[in-house]
Regions:
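Type III/flagellar secretion export determinants
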Residues: 1-105
Length: 105
């Protein structure tokens, strides 16, 4: 049961980190997956926070949003594979914004 309690704390801290760093890009959550322990209590064993990765209309906004997506995705001390995947979307959005901005100048 101590392992479930630790997992619950870790999962909640992980998702909270996404929320705190995700100003303006977090769309939902945290949503948790629960497991019942031998004591009959629910323990969070997984979770997710929705992050808006859709492009904006202006290059400057895409740069800003891409940076914020990366910050939100990589905020936990132990990013998951999904977190790294979302961060890559942020990198692409930021890069595209920078390319579009340089073409306008």
């Amino acid at each position: 049961m101590a392992e479930l309690q630790q997992t619950d704390r870790d999962v909640r801290a992980h998702e909270q980190a996404h929320l705190l760093a995700g100003r303006g890009v977090v769309t939902s959550g945290p949503d948790y997956t629960y497991t019942y322990g031998p004591d009959g209590k629910r323990y969070a064993t997984g979770g997710e926070v929705g992050i808006d990765t859709s492009p904006e209309h202006k290059p400057e906004d895409n740069i800003d949003k891409g940076v914020r997506i990366q910050a939100a995705a990589l905020a936990p001390k132990d990013p998951s594979a999904q977190d790294y995947q979302v961060a890559r979307v942020g990198v692409k959005l930021e890069t595209q914004g920078r390319q579009d901005l340089s073409q306008q100048q």
